[in-house]
Amino acid sequence: MPLELELCPGRWVGGQHPCFIIAEIGQNHQGDLDVAKRMIRMAKECGADCAKFQKSELEFKFNRKALERPYTSKHSWGKTYGEHKRHLEFSHDQYRELQRYAEEVGIFFTASGMDEMAVEFLHELNVPFFKVGSGDTNNFPYLEKTAKKGRPMVISSGMQSMDTMKQVYQIVKPLNPNFCFLQCTSAYPLQPEDVNLRVISEYQKLFPDIPIGYSGHETGIAISVAAVALGAKVLERHITLDKTWKGSDHSASLEPGELAELVRSVRLVERALGSPTKQLLPCEMACNEKLGKSVVAKVKIPEGTILTMDMLTVKVGEPKGYPPEDIFNLVGKKVLVTVEEDDTIMEELVDNHGKKIKS
């Protein structure tokens, strides 16, 4: 069983704990604080466990030329990439306001620290856990510094190889045992054939002492629900108030109705996963009573007869007697009284104390 860890105060993940559902707001708030608050409330009302943003200190995430390059996409909020990103970036004070709002609403609040200085700010903000975006998963100095902060870590694996993920594990594990990996493919929207849910199972084999989850960028909810059925203990999906809004993430995001349905479906699947123990359940008793079969006499069997297979058959009997799986054990035993043809073979009719007699 994968290791359990306390990802947020009082909220454990892994083992038999419910899947932790992260509503990734990212920058789908359009740079509007009120929209961001509406999305936090929406995440809570739909049943998500956590509302998550993306925090960057732009001069530490991008070099000058990257910020100055022209940005002419239909999704652009400025003439340069820097202007575009600044429009979408909340200040430290605004982050504190959003954190307070999430606390009022009653949902956990965190963000991906998109650079080392952003991680420093989030650490100061006292977020419950750090989310490592796929773009920083192979940034080993960043990983080391983040791990040393001591907070739980959720690490996405988009754009990475299995060899890289093994290195990530080896770097983080000695510094901070409280982390998990998310299978992720960095494409928006993600096509089903590129999801590779089987990586979840491979991660579970290679890293059996950490929880494994899934970060999805596909459309719809079916694939994410399947990830939970495969054992994903953390599930992250982007959310939006309107898929048609400006921004490259909106088309791969879930609107309120979809998020609510995702949460309902995940919780339903968790109930359906149930127990690995196979046994006759109380809910099956009525069906078993009506349709369950018993061993019956194929012919009239006189008192003292040693039972052979050609004397026995299996039918729905009234009353119930030996279940079909006991039929081979009855062969070689003696009947204590005469059993009429088509009667149920009852326990009191058979000598169960003596040894089986070879016929």
Curated annotation (Swiss-Prot):
Residues 294-353 form the AFP-like domain. Keywords: Acetylation, Disease variant, Dwarfism, Intellectual disability, Phosphoprotein, Transferase. It holds the Pfam family NeuB. GO terms for cellular component: cytoplasm; cytosol; extracellular exosome. The keyword Acetylation applies. It catalyses: aldehydo-N-acetyl-D-mannosamine 6-phosphate + phosphoenolpyruvate + H2O = N-acetylneuraminate 9-phosphate + phosphate; aldehydo-D-mannose 6-phosphate + phosphoenolpyruvate + H2O = 3-deoxy-D-glycero-beta-D-galacto-non-2-ulopyranosonate 9-phosphate + phosphate. Ubiquitous. InterPro entries: AFP_Neu5c_C, AFP_Neu5c_C_sf, Aldolase_TIM, Antifreeze_III, Neu5Ac_N, Nonulosonic_Acid_Synth, SAF. One of its GO terms (biological process) is N-acetylneuraminate biosynthetic process. Gene3D superfamilies: Aldolase class I, Antifreeze-like/N-acetylneuraminic acid synthase C-terminal domain. The modification Phosphoserine is found at residue 275. The modification N6-acetyllysine is found at residues 61, 74, 79, 290. Its EC number is 2.5.1.57, 2.5.1.132. The keyword Phosphoprotein applies. GO terms for molecular function: N-acetylneuraminate synthase activity; N-acylneuraminate-9-phosphate synthase activity. It is an enzyme of class 2 (transferase). This is N-acetylneuraminate-9-phosphate synthase. It comes from Homo sapiens (Human). The lineage of its organism: Eukaryota, Metazoa, Chordata, Craniata, Vertebrata. The gene is NANS.
